Amino acid sequence: VGSEMCIRDRVYEESQPFVLGLTTGRTPLGLYRELVKRHHEGQISFRNVAVYSLDEFYPIRSTERQSRNYRIHEEFLNHIDILPENVHIPDGTVPEDRVSEYCASYDHSVRRIDLMIIGVGEDGQIGFNEPGSYSRSRTRLVQLTYNTRKIQSGAFFGLENTPKMAVTMGIDTIMRANRIILMAWGEEKAHIVQRVVEGEITDQVPASYLQAHQNIEVVIDENAA
């Protein structure tokens, strides 16, 4: 990933940054730490990189420790030289009567993603595209399933405090990326990885839609294989 950004940085003009789609959670932490390490060693600069984050809880303030905004800054963005104006993260504080308009605007701003980094959930979701998500879905406000909220509830100190909704890039938005890296670690992901990679394409396993992408790499550890 770092090498790819360095190569593109040499051929892109400043008006055309390398556009990186990012996710949060445990899955990409190792990658982010490696990119930060390479940055501190002088191997990579992020000044010609723009990032678009995949999703955010709703409603939530960016200063709350459980927010995607807070986490991606703490885990990655605060440790590199990316320009603040090149950071794009869904806003979890948009008034409810403006959410649809905001989501359409965010989706429109994601005109080009050079590389999308994503993980896969235990139910086959990507971002907050839960089972049942439409293949042509765009950035939108979604209802979180009970299972997703239960998984997230530890961070929110109880299910009753866990948001019931989220803003997420849609399947179609993700599929527009020029290249996708899908990552999964651990034995608990082995079953869903098999369905994503070898199973039928179905809305019940949203990540299975990625089989139709022309330039995707699946990176897993031995336990998830």
Residue ranges, per PLM feature:
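Short, small-residue-biased leader/transition segments that mark boundaries at the very start
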Residues: 1-7
